Every structure is written in C-alpha cells, then in structure tokens.
From Swiss-Prot:
Family: Belongs to the PsaA/PsaB family.
Quaternary structure, from the entry: The PsaA/B heterodimer binds the P700 chlorophyll special pair and subsequent electron acceptors. PSI consists of a core antenna complex that captures photons, and an electron transfer chain that converts photonic excitation into a charge separation. The eukaryotic PSI reaction center is composed of at least 11 subunits.
Protein name: Photosystem I P700 chlorophyll a apoprotein A2
InterPro entries xref list: PSI_PsaA/B, PSI_PsaA/B_CS, PSI_PsaA/B_sf, PSI_PsaB
Catalytic activity reported: reduced [plastocyanin] + hnu + oxidized [2Fe-2S]-[ferredoxin] = oxidized [plastocyanin] + reduced [2Fe-2S]-[ferredoxin]
C-alpha cells in the first residue's frame, strides 16, 4: 500500500477513488502539505530543485544552438540577414505528401524546414557568433554547464552538503550573493564579452579563444582607465555609414552615449549597450556590498525595516515587523519575486520592439510580433501568480500579532476602501470606453461617420513632445528647438536620440490619435479589473464580510452549499481563477492593438488603423477578419502552402479553447452520472469487461474541473492567437 501514488501523502494514497490521482497531481508541488515535511527539508528540496530548473534551461538553450548549427542556415544568413530567412530546424516528416515537402522547403534549404521567429539568429550575430562551429562550441559549453548544475542539485541533497535553515534565512548574505555575485559580476562579464568579442566582431575583427589575448579592444588599451581619461573610450564612435560586421565606416570607441539607432541595422549602438551593462554592473556591485554580512559593517535589513516608521504618527508603524514576516514566509518571497519578474517581462516586451538591441531584428517583422506577444503573455501569467502566492501568504503565514498596525495590517484594515476604489475605476473605464466604441459603431452603421466622438490624446502627445517628438507642433522641452535641453542634446548627451524619435522607420514614440486613445482606455479597463479581482482575492483570503472564518478552509475551498452564507466563488483560488480570464482578455487587447498598428505601419497604410480602430466593427472586420483570411481558406484547388500548418493550428486552437467550456459550464452531478453510466456499460460489455481498475471513478471536484477548463481555455486561446499572428504577419512580409 505504501508504494501507491502519491507517496508524499499516505492519506491520499489510501483513497479508494480516482480522486487519489487528481489530488496527488494537484498537491505534488505543495511541499508544505506533504507528510513528514520539516521546515529544513522544505527549504532544501526547493533549493535543490532550482539546480534542476537551471539544468533544464541550459539543456534547452544548448539544443537551440545545436539544431541551428546542424540543420539551420546561420552562415548563409550572416552573409545577407535581410533577405535570407533564418531556419530553426528541419521537419522530418512533413504532412502530407509531396506538396508539403515543396511548401516547407525554403530559406535555401535542401529539404523541408521550419523558419525561426525567435530572434536567436539576430542575437547570436550581434554578440559576435559567425560560424556553425561557434554554435556547436556554444552548445557543448551549455551542455557541460547543464551537467554541472545537475550534479550540484544532487550534491545539495546529500547529508554532508545540505544547507541549514539559518543559511537560507541569512538575508544579507543572500543579497550580497545575488546582487553582487550574480547580477553585478554577470553584467561585468557581459560587458567584457561585448567589448572584447561583439564590438570587434561588428567591425569585421574575428576574436576567438586563440587570439583574444592579442587583440586590443581599444587602441589605447587600459591606459585611459588608469589615468582617469575615461572619455577617450567614447571618442571616434562608429559612423552613420558603418556596415555592420565590416570595418567600413567603423570607429574605435568601446563605451559611448550616442543614443538612437545604427542606421543600417536599426538597432541600438553596441557601444551604447556595453556602456549600459558596465553601469548596471557598477550599481549592482555596490548595492550588493551595502548589507552587513560576516564583517560587521553595512546595513542590517531588520534594522532598516524597523526604522521605516512614517513621522507624524498618523500612518501607523510602517515596516515594523516586516523582516520576520517576509523572511519566514516563502510565499511572500515568491510573491515579491513573481511581481518583479512579471513587470520586467512586460518591460522586455515593450523595449524589444521600441529599442531593439539586436542587429536587423527590427526589420524581421514576424519575429518582432512573436517576441512582443510571447513576452506579454508570459508576463500576465507571472503577475497573476504573484497575487496567488500573496493570498496563500495571508492564509498560511500571516500573523496579525507580529504585524500590528504596520503597512500589511493597514492594507487589511483599509481593504474596503481599496477594493471599492478599484471597482469604481473599473466601472468608470468600462462604461465610458464601451459607450464611446458603441456610439461610434452605431454612427458608422447608420452612415454618419462624421458624428463619431473622437478624442485626441493630447496629454500623451504632450509627453511625447516633451521627449523630442516634433510632429504634433507642441514646441515644448526637447521638441522646442530654442531650448537649452534641445541644444545640449545635440552634443553632450545622446545626440542620436532626437533623430530616432522623429524618424518614421522605427517604433519609438509612434504617432497616436483617437483610435489609440480608445484602445488605451480599453486596456486600462482590463488592467484595473484584473487588478481588482486579484487584490480582492488576496485581501479577502483570510476572511471577508460574508465569511469571516476563511483561514482554516485554506486557499481553494469549493462551493459548500448555503451553510455559512454560501461559499461559492469566495475562496482566494476562485479570485485567481477569475482573474486569469481577465488577464488573457487584457493581453488580447494589448496584442491586437500592437499588431494591427504595426502591420499598418510596416505596410505603409497607417490610415487604415487610424480610421478603423475607433469603432468595434473596424476591429472585427479590418483587423481580425481581414488578417485571418489565409487561415480560414479551407480546401482550395491550389493545394497546401507553407501557411497550411498555421491554418490547422488556428482550427485546433479553437477546438481546445471550446473544450474548456465543457468543463467550465457544467455541473458535477452530470459528470458523476455520466461516469457511472459509462462504468456500468463497460462492466457489462464482453472483452471490455476483462479490463478492471482499482479506483472507483468519481467526477472531478468543482475546483479541479475549473482548473481543467481554465487550462484548456488558456492554451486554446494562445494557440489560436499564435497561429493568427505568425501566419498573418509572415504571409505579408515573409
């Protein structure tokens, strides 16, 4: 009996129904709830699993490098990055038949291949890789690192190498290691790579292990560093006529503040990027040494937090008690980490297209669209996760006595005001935005487009003007040619910035109008509503007006009838579940907006977006329907083409998405009856009744069925949009 799944819970292992399997899967990673768990084992298991996670990441990236080196066309792409389509890997068995083989043979390949829309070619090219041998070397190196991490993970589970709980709770040493050791040193190392390998590579100089000690990255070597003449490293930058990867028009500078973009590659100057990483390294190396570790100097985190009490006395006890609360709660720490990582991931999406760092990636439109959408979806899932673990913190780890009148307690005291304000903002945004869209829609339908309500986003335009955009005629700050800031910007700092802002060949400070104003507020509605649901879920996790006693019911209690006033949809889990739908909805609006605006920019018909985005039918007809034409083609006399796989995925994504509703809109009793009927029929059917099972089949619980429904909804939604995005963009631009 002891060997039945799940081994971590004897109670579940003895459950006679299929609930054993589902609950086992659901709680496999909830280490806190496992039998015989101690705080020490909990921390050690999580620590060891981090090494496994890193090993998988390095193995995966190694696989990317290996497959491109083996089956890709990196070397021919390097010769002509704008016209050769980068190959991700070969397709072993293209479906169906000879037409498929022909459709997928592209990018100069001899057989069927997949095109890469991940941007790895541009990244590898920018950082100095040039040959397949370079890629193989990188793949082997990462494979080696992966093995090291696997060994390290195993090692830290051995009795002699297991760290103690006190080691895990030593916050200052961890800050020292993470800030200085990981962020600081890795940023410094990356600066070194850019200066010693990537920048010479961009100037046609091939630096590798055999010659990197002989090639001076800068003609004056380390002289300017030791004599304090650091400005010499910025002199003689690459010229505007520089051809990337060659010495033609190249300079000698290694650390610059040029601003703007390299005219040929449309990406940030590599010397600016190196300078940025050096600054980051300096900041983090200093930051990591501000806290008191073994030497008795520096700040104590506990003292810092306890001293953070707002003067005047009307705002409570500030951060008092937070140190122990955070340091003893893994859920709080995970919540903070996820919130930070989620914001950073969304910022990556925003900056990868507006300030592209990799050579020629800005001209690879499908890759730009794929990377933006990918990072926004990832950010959404990570950010909702932050609130989920925040709610679990309140249920499992929050101690009211320890946090009396501090910022956490005051958040709970004021939760009604917080929730009602968020609710008001969401209602205001929703009704006004929808009202404008619907009004405009009706005006178009009745043939009186001039009666639309069109609002110019003057505040946003003013902000863009303040940063140097001249087309609105605001004549303020950096867009005012007579101002001191403008004149300083021509010479002292970032001289390329103003050119970049006012050029139409990039996505920096796009011109905005009434369509942008409306969709901006639609997105604001989505963000505020998602936040409302998540914040309410976390703040009401321990107890709410309807049910003040939630603590002992945990995170995901199900509907429990009318007792205690009814518990349907009031667990923290239910709030998270509802918020994910709103998150997906919001990111849908964000990506629709980004994609449609960029498609019209890239095609040179931006007036289509401007005119059609102010009413609902415009979005449905001129964005969704018009761009899905290649995906809803069905069978035609011309046979298949290279977009057929996306057409199939578009259909399949809709199917998966629709299956979600089968779990979301049905009652548990219906499933239980269906299961009983099927089991009864099975047991009375010859041959079939030879197969028996030990577990009595029972329907999923309400919470489980919602999870299965949500998973299908999310996966189907993303599959559908991914197929639409890649097919509609690559169909137009290759």
């Amino acid at each position: 009996m002891a060997l039945r799944f799940p081994r971590f819970s004897q109670g579940l292992a003895q459950d006679p129904t299929t609930r054993r399997i589902w609950f086992g899967i659901a709680t496999a990673h909830d280490f806190e709830s496992h039998d015989d768990i101690t705080e020490e084992r909990l921390y050690q298991n999580i620590f060891a699993s981090h090494f496994g996670q890193l090993a998988i990441i390095f193995l995966w990236t190694s696989g990317n490098l290996f497959h491109v080196a083996w089956q890709g066309n990196f070397e021919s792409w390097v010769q002509d990055p704008l016209h050769v389509r980068p190959i991700a890997h070969a397709i072993w068995d293209p479906h169906f038949g000879q037409p498929a083989v022909e459709a997928f043979t592209r990018g100069g390949a001899l057989g069927p291949v997949n095109i890469a829309y991940s941007g790895v070619y541009q990244w590898w090219y920018t950082i100095g890789l040039r040959t397949n041998e370079d890629l193989y070397t990188g793949a082997l190196f990462l494979l080696f690192i992966s093995a090291i991490f696997l060994i390290a993970g195993w090692l830290h589970l051995q009795p002699k190498w297991k760290p103690s709980v006190s080691w895990f709770k030593n916050a200052e040493s961890r800050l020292n290691h993470h800030l200085s050791g990981l962020f600081g040193v890795s940023s410094l190392a990356w600066t070194g790579h850019l200066v010693h390998v990537a920048i010479p590579g961009s100037r046609g100089e091939y630096v590798r292990w055999n010659n990197f000690l002989d090639v001076l990255p800068h003609p004056q070597g380390l002289g300017p560093l030791f004599t304090g003449q650091w400005n010499l490293y910025a002199q003689n930058p690459d010229s505007g006529s520089h051809l990337f990867g060659t010495s033609q028009g190249a300079g000698t500078a290694i650390l610059t503040l040029l601003g703007g973009f390299h005219p040929q590659t449309q990406s940030l100057w590599l010397t600016d990027i190196a300078h940025h990483h050096l600054a980051i390294a300096f900041i983090f190396l200093v930051a990591g040494h501000m806290y008191r570790t073994n030497f008795g100097i520096g700040h104590s985190m506990k003292d810092l937090l306890d001293a953070h009490i707002p003067p005047g006395g009307r705002l409570g006890r500030g951060h008092k008690g937070l140190y122990d609360t955070i340091n003893n709660s893994l859920h709080f720490q995970l919540g903070l980490a996820l919130a930070s990582l989620g914001v950073i991931t969304s910022l990556v999406a925003q900056h990868m297209y507006s300030l592209p760092a990799y050579a020629f990636i800005a001209q690879d439109f499908t890759t730009q669209a794929a990377l933006y959408t990918h990072h926004q979806y990832i950010a959404g899932f990570i950010m909702t996760g932050a609130f989920a673990h925040g709610a679990i913190f309140f249920i499992r780890d929050y101690n009211p006595e320890q946090n009396e009148d501090n910022v956490l307690a005051r958040m709970l005291d004021h939760k009604e005001a917080i929730i009602s304000h968020l609710s008001w903002a969401s209602l205001f945004l929703g009704f006004h935005t929808l009202g404008l869209y619907v009004h405009n829609d009706v005006m178009l339908a009745f043939g009186t487009p001039e009666k639309q309500i069109l609002i110019e986003p003057i505040f946003a335009q003013w902000i863009q003007s303040a940063h140097g955009k001249t087309s609105y005629g605001f004549d303020v700050l950096l867009s005012s040619t007579s101002g001191p800031a403008f004149n300083a910007g021509r010479s002292i700092w970032l001289p390329g910035w103003l050119n970049a802002v006012n050029e139409n060949s990039n996505s920096l400070f796009l011109t905005i109008g009434p369509g942008d104003f409306l969709v901006h507020h639609a997105i604001a509605l989505g963000l505020h509503t998602t936040t409302l649901i998540l914040v309410k879920g976390a703040l009401d996790a321990r107890g709410s007006k309807l049910m003040p006693d939630k603590k002992d019911f945990g995170y995901s209690f199900p509907c429990d009838g009318p007792g205690r006033g009814g518990t349907c949809d009031i667990s923290a889990w239910d709030a998270f579940y509802l918020a994910v739908f709103w998150m997906l909805n919001t990111i849908g609006w964000v990506t629709f907006y980004w994609h449609w605006k960029h498609i019209t920019l890239w095609q040179g018909n931006v007036s289509q977006f401007n005119e059609s985005s102010t009413y609902l039918m415009g979005w449905l007809r001129d964005y969704l329907w018009l761009n899905s034409s290649q995906l809803i083609n069905g069978y035609n006399p011309f046979g298949m083409n290279s977009l057929s796989v996306w057409a199939w995925m578009f259909l399949f994504g809709h199917l998966v998405w629709a299956i979600g509703f089968m779990f979301l809109i049905s009652w548990r009793g219906y499933w239980q009856e269906l299961i009983e009927t099927l089991a009864w029929a099975h047991e009375r059917t010859p041959l079939a009744n030879l197969i028996r099972w030990r577990d009595k089949p029972v329907a999923l619980s309400i919470v489980q069925a919602r999870l299965v429904g949500l998973a299908h909804f999310s996966v189907g939604y993303i599959f559908t949009y991914a197929a639409f995005l890649i097919a509609s963009t690559s169909g137009k631009f290759g």
